[in-house]
């Protein structure tokens, strides 16, 4: 049996749920529950409410998805958010 084709959508994280799950508003208007993909957990990529993400879904269940990519911010330079302490401020021993 062949592996089914997965569908990719883009959306916006609206709410963080327990157990590394997120409520995501898709660009098409639907709202789904998505979980973090294993590679994102392994690389400790954090996702916050308001982040743009790419979701992978099975054509058989369009209510759940896997969060596979967090898009970088549109801030110029893609640097840290305002108010964050500059890197290298604290000395490591």
From Swiss-Prot:
GO cellular component annotations of the record: cytosol
Residues covered by region (Disordered): 70-93
Keywords of this entry: Cytoplasm, Initiation factor, Protein biosynthesis, RNA-binding, rRNA-binding
Classification via PROSITE patterns: S1_IF1_TYPE
GO molecular function, one term: translation initiation factor activity
Domain of life the protein comes from: Bacteria
Subcellular location: Cytoplasm
All residue ranges annotated as the S1-like domain in the record: 1-72
InterPro entries xref list: NA-bd_OB-fold, RNA-binding_domain_S1_IF1, TIF_IF1
Main function: One of the essential components for the initiation of protein synthesis. Stabilizes the binding of IF-2 and IF-3 on the 30S subunit to which N-formylmethionyl-tRNA(fMet) subsequently binds. Helps modulate mRNA selection, yielding the 30S pre-initiation complex (PIC). Upon addition of the 50S ribosomal subunit IF-1, IF-2 and IF-3 are released leaving the mature 70S translation initiation complex.
Family, per entry: Belongs to the IF-1 family.
Complex formation: Component of the 30S ribosomal translation pre-initiation complex which assembles on the 30S ribosome in the order IF-2 and IF-3, IF-1 and N-formylmethionyl-tRNA(fMet); mRNA recruitment can occur at any time during PIC assembly.
HAMAP family on file: IF_1
Name used for this protein in its record: Translation initiation factor IF-1
